[in-house]
C-alpha cells in the first residue's frame, strides 16, 4: 500500500532476508528459486528415468536440499530416548542416527533425499549419484546467486535506494501484507507489513491520510523504514513541532536520510522491531479514517507521511512496535488508538476517518483509530489543514494497507450498522471535520448534508465504497462534496457519481443526497407547481442538472433548514450517530433494502418536498415531529416521506412514517427493513433513504421522488431511483423510473420480515407511531393543513375540514385505522368511511384543485373507506359519488380519480381487482395489490392522479396484513398505506408525473409529468400479509389472495405506466412496465387504462413460485395494457375476451399451471420464501410465463388493468375463484383480473358477463358461496389448508371480503346482474365449469362488480372498473364483492357486461 515503504526484497533481504528472514523467502533465495528452473527440469527428467514421479519428487527433493534444516541437538536427544527405550531394535537405528548427527547438514539432506527417492523408486541404483549431481548443481546456483547479490549490495551502499521503486513496492507490499511470523531482526523494510509499514513507513501516510496526504506522499517507505527508525526518533524529538513542520522537514530529511542511508538493512533490522512494536501499536491505526485516504497518503508517498506526521512517524513506529508485540492484535491497535488518536487528533484534524469515538469501539483493529483521531482532530486547524490536503491528495487513493487491513472495518454487514457507520456517527467531530471540508460540502451539500455538520461529516467522514473500494469520504470531501454533496444536493456531479458509484458506495451520502436530489427537482421545477418527484419524473432526463441546481438551492435554503433542523433534532432525538450508523448499515446492507435509519435520516432532511423538507421523512413521524413540529407540512411530508422512504420497500415507504410501527424495515420490501426495525425512528428515514438511495442514482428521480408535496421519496425516487438501484429493476421497462422505482420498491415489500412479526410490529408500532403522529402530525398537519396535503403536495382547499378530521382522526382513528401509523390517513379513511359522501363532495368541490383537500381526503378517505368501510354501503355510496365525479367531472378528474380510487379501493376490496377508476376513460383507476396491499392506480384528470387504496374491508385485514401495503396514488402522488396502518399508508410513495400542485390536466400532459411514469409494485403478498390472513383466515385480509399461509399468495408486480393525456408526446419515451403497462403503447385504449391520461396499469398476480417475467403489453395481447380500456370498450361488445382468448386460446390454461402449482405447492411454498420475494423454480417456466401472460392477457381482456385486477383478483376474484376454481383460481384470478379490468373501464362486465355469467352466477350467489364449500370455507373458515382451492379461496376470497360481505356482494351481483350474466356464462354454471368459465366469470364478475359499483358510483366506467375488480376476483367473490361495493351498480354493470 505504501509504495515508499515498499521493502526492496531483492536488494534489502539479500542476505538478511535469506539468512535471517524466516518468513518470506529472501531476495537471494527468490532469485535462486528463479534460477532453479533448468535444474528442476533436469531433475524431473532424471527422476522419470528412474521411474519416480517427477511432478511430486522434483519439488520435494529440491525443497529438502535447499530449505530443510536439521536440529542436531534435538536429533541426538531423540536418539538417546529411542536408545533408552529399545536398545535392541532401535540401537542400530539410534547409532545410525547418531552417525547422521555426525554428518553435516548437507550430507544429511543428501541422505534424506536418497532415502526418499529410493522409497519411491524400484531401482536403487543411480539415485545416490543423481542426488550428488543435483547437490552440486544447486551449490553452483547458490554460489552464483550469492555472487550476484554481493555485487549488487557492494555496488550500492543503499541497495534499497538502488532497488527500483516497483521492486520495493512489491516486496514491501508483500511483507506488509504478509509480515514474517518471527520477530527476528529482519530488515525493517522486509518486516514491514501492510500494518507495520502503514505504521512505520505509511503511518505517516496514515496520519497524513488523515492529516496531510501530501505529507504522506513520502513514498520512500522502505527507505522510510530505515530512516524511519531514525525519523521515528527524530520525530519523537520533533513531535512537539507542528505536524506539518515536522512532517515536511522530516519527510524531506527522512527521505534524504532514508534514501541516502546505505545502512538501510542495519537500521531497519534494528528499527523494524522497534517500529513493529513501538510505532506499530500506536500508529497502527494509520489513517483508517479512510482506507482509501490512508492508502492514498501511503501511495501518495511517505513524504506526506513524514511531513504530516513526524510525530506520526514516532507514533506509528511505536504503534508498529506495539502491534508487533501484540501480534497486531486488535487490542494493541486499540490501545495504540488512543495515543494514536491523540496524535492524530493533532495531525489529522480533518482525518477522513474521524470516527474516533466509534472507531475505538468499532475498530478494535486500530484501523479506525485514525478515523477517530480524525474526528477528534477536526478541532485542530492543523489537522484540518492536513486533512484537507490529505483528503485532496488521497481522496480516492487507497494505500496498499487496506489490502491486508481487515476490510471489515470498512465493509460492515449490510444489516448491521457498519463500523463505518458507527465511525461516521461517532465522527460527529467530523462536524468539526474541517470548516474547509464542511464548507466545501456545504457549498454543494452543506445545506442538506451538512445542515447538521454531524450528518454531513458523517457522510464525509464515513467515506464510501467507490468501485468496490472504500474511500473515506473526508478524504474525498472535495469530490464527496460533489459526490456526497451532489447526492445530497442533487448536484449534477452527484447524479453522475450516483450512477458511477454504487449505492453501497454512497450509502451514507445517499441518505441525504438522494433526498435532496429528489427535493431539488421538486424544489425548483416542482416548486413551480409540480412536486419534485413529479417534476423529476417528468424531467428525468433533463432533471439531473436542473434538479441539482434548483434542488440545491431549495435544499440549501428552505429545505436545508428543514434538513438541518431535522438532522439536528434527528441526531439529537435519534442520535446522529445512531441514525447514521443505522443508515450507513442499511445503506451498506443494500440500497435495495430500505435502510431504516439512514434513509430516514436523509429522508428526514428531505422530509418535505421543496416546500416540505424531506428531512421530516428522516425519522418517521416521531423524529420529524420533534424536528418539524412547527413544520406541519414537513411533518406530513415526513410521514408521507417516511412512507416514501419505504417507498422503495415497495409501499412500506408510504407507511414508513405513519406506519413506522409497520416497521418498514419489515415491510419495506423487507430488504433493509430489519435495520429499520432496529431503528424505528430511523426507519422512516431509512425508507426515504432507501428510496432515496435507490433512486439516488437518478438525480432527477431523487428530487422528483421526494415530491415537495409528497415529501416522500416515493414520489419520484421510488419510481426509478430506489427501485432501480435497490431492486435492480426486475422489469425491462426501467425507462420510467416511476414504474421502475415502484417496481423495485414493490418486490420485497414484506418479504423481509415475517408477516406476523411485521403485523405485530405494525400494530404496536402503529399505535406508537399513531400517538407520535397524532402528537406530531397535528402540529405539522394543522400547519400544513393536512398530512394528505403534505402527502399529496397539494394544499387541500377542503383541507380545513379534512385536516381537522385528519388530525382528529389521527388521534381518534389511529387505532381505528388498523394501525394507521399516520392518524391522518386513517382519519381520512375514517372520514371517508364515515362520510364517504363528504369525501366525495370534497373531491367534487376540489375539482379545480383536484389535489387539494379533495385529493388528500380522497387518499386518506380512500384508505379509510377501504379500511374502515371495508364493504360498507356508505363506501359504495362514496364510491358512486366519486365515480360520478370521475365520469361527471373530467375537470375534477383527479378528484374523481380519488373518489374512484376510493370507490375502487373500497369497492374492489380485493387488491387484485382493478377498481372502477379504470373504467372511466378520463380517470383510469387501477386497483392492484402492491406489496401485499391492494392498491388502485387512479388517474385524475390528465394529471392522472393515482390513488391506490386498500379495499374497504381492508380496515381490519389490511391492518392485519401489515405486510401488505396499500399504495394510494392520488393525483401525482403515490401513497403507500401499509396493510396494517392505512393512515401512514397514504403517504405518497411517489408522485406520478403530475404533481398535485399541477392539478390541471395540462400539468399532467405538459409538465413533464413523467412521460408516463410507471411504477411497478412488486409485492410479496405472502410475505406481507400471509400471516395476517392466517391469523384472521379470511375476511379481514385485504389481500385475500395473499395469504401468507397461502403459498399461492402471489408476489404482485404491478407496473403502472401513466402517461397523462398531456404527456402523449412523452408516451414514446414511456414504456409501460411489462406487467403493468396497460395502455402505454396504445393511446386508443388509454381512456380505459389511463383515466384521463394514458395510465397503463398491469398487475400480475404471481403465485409465490410463479415465474414472473415482465411481459410487455404487446407481448400479452394486441391491446397490451391498453387492452383493458380497449377491451372494456370491446367488453361491451364481448370482443376483448375473445381477443384475449385469441391471444391465449385458453387463458386459464396458462394460468392453471400457476394456480395448480400454487395450490399444490403453495402450502409448501414457504411464507418466508414468498416474503423474501423468492419464487420457487418449481413452477414450470412455461407455465409460469404462460400464467403470467395469461393473467396479463386476462387483464388486457378485462382491461389493461387486468394485472391489477388480477392482483385484486387475488383478493376478491381469487377468493371467488378459490371457491369456484381452487386450482384454477390463480389463473382465473389473473384472467378475471384481466376481464375485470376490461370491464372496469367500459364495463368489461359485458364481455366478462357474457362469458362468465353462468359461472359468475354460480359462484356469485351467496348460496353459491355456500355452494362452493371451498369458497365458503375461505370466507368463513379461511382455512387455507382446507383445500388447494381453499387456501386460494381464502387467500383471494375471504381476506378480501368477509363471508357475509362476499355473500352480500354476490347477492347484489346476482340479484342485480348475476342472473342476467348467468346466461352469458351459464355454460359454466357449476363448479366443474369454474375453470373453463373462470375467465368469463372473472369478467362477468368484473362487470358485475362494475355494475354494482356503477350503481353505487353512478358512473358505469368507474363502476365497471370497480365491479370489474370485484368480479375479477372471482365470479362469486366478484359478484359478492361487486354487490358489497355497489349492489345496484352490479346489475347495471352486468347488463352492460351482457351487452
UniProtKB/Swiss-Prot annotation:
The keyword Oxidoreductase does not apply. InterPro entries: DUF4603. Residues 230-269, 337-346, 369-391, 1346-1359 have a biased composition (Basic and acidic residues). GO terms for molecular function: ATP binding. Residues 155-166, 205-222, 287-301, 349-358 have a biased composition (Low complexity). Residues 146-166, 205-391, 1110-1132, 1346-1395 are annotated as: Disordered. The modification Phosphoserine is found at residues 814, 1080, 1194, 1338. Residues 313-328 have a biased composition (Basic residues). ATP binds at residues 89-96. Keywords: ATP-binding, Nucleotide-binding, Phosphoprotein. This is Uncharacterized protein KIAA0232. It comes from Homo sapiens.
